[in-house]
Amino acid sequence: MEINASKRGPRLHVKLCGELDHHSAEQTRNMLDTLLKDIPVRDLTLDLSGVSFMDSAGLGVILGRYRILSMRGGHLTVTGMSGAIDKIFRMSGIYAIVDRV
């Protein structure tokens, strides 16, 4: 998994590239947590346009970052989902708590 991050005002924008599955979930989780620790923001946008595959472990990574941001009073936004990933999100009900653009 490749991660590119940039701070845009009060928001951290992170683009993920690769597969977000059980093989990459721990590494991705650790990298995102380090970013959220080092860059004190309340709001995070995850650009998933470069994610070619996601399974339930990837969904868990996103839900965990939602929890961290919620405890800070912040928001998580996702963007750039492929049709397959959008379907996973709709079926899981994640759009009830995570914003999408």
List PLM regions with ranges:
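STAS-typified acidic loop motif
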Residues: 4-30
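Conserved catalytic submotifs in the C-terminal HATPase_c
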Residues: 8-9, 49, 101
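Absolute protein N-terminus
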Residues: 1-2, 101
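Amphipathic alpha-helical interaction surfaces in cytosolic regulatory modules
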Residues: 22-98
